[in-house]
Structures are given as structure tokens and as C-alpha cells.
């Protein structure tokens, strides 16, 4: 999450669920991977005249000014702002900010890989899920494959932007089921 936030200068929201948050199980220590690291933070002095939101026209990404960085004084708010970081209520400035955010998401999507399909690349049924449903889905799909059924599974790691190739993967199966384990209301509670 930090690597995405630092690389694309954007907010990242990590979604989880109660089962994942409260479950306990042993796991193998992961092998360190350099690809997990965020790029180093540029703390050099900001060039004279540089604007804190000088968005790149193709990626929407601007150099990140670090608090306390020489020449990097600017305002940070959740409101629409111009390239100099002044709050602005002008529709053109708002549109420019929206476009920059959209370009950042598009740039991120270009770095994502399609979700891995567990089982055959095509078949009768594809079961898709995210979060803690992964283990149950893979276990059920494996049991059905052991019975000779053409069932595969896929696990989504990104919801916005979506990983590329999902539509093409889904088209290779006769049926697709998505699993959502969000239901937790008491059925007797009206």
C-alpha cells in the first residue's frame, strides 16, 4: 500500500474483513522481495518556482513536497486546489484535479498484472472472491476439480482500479460466481 501511495502520489485504502482481521493461523515467513519497497523519498531542495501540484499531463503525478523540505511550503487540504495549492472553487480547476486523479489511477492500473486463475484457464465455472474468502473458495474449487468438475477460482487483490484482463478471464468460463461474505445481519431482525 505504501509503495502505491508513494509511487503514484495518491491515497490508498486497504480493505479487510472481520474473518481476516480476527483469524489466527500459522504461515511461512515470506521471502523479502525488493519489489515491495517504495521508491526513496526525494528530500532535495525544491527548485525555485516549482509548484506542489504541477501534475504531469500523461500520468497526473506531481513531485511530492515533504513537510519541512526547503522551498516546499504549501497547503494541504481535502478541497479542490490549483497547482500552487490554493483552495479554489473554480470548475476548471476542479476538473483539472479530477483529471489528474483519474490519470494516476490509470497509470497504476498499467502496472497491475491480471489475477491468477487457480485451476484450468477455461472451463465450466469460475469462482471469484477477495479478502478472506480466498481459502474457502480455493478449497471448494479444488474439491470439485478432484471430482472431475471444470471449476477454477480467481482472487481479486485490487478493487479500484481493477486488475487488467478480468473480463477476458471471465469470458473463458460458461458461468461465473462471485462470493461476497458481507452478510452478517440477524435474519430474524426486521
Regions found by a protein language model. Name each.
Residues 3-190:
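Flexible, low-complexity linker and terminal segments
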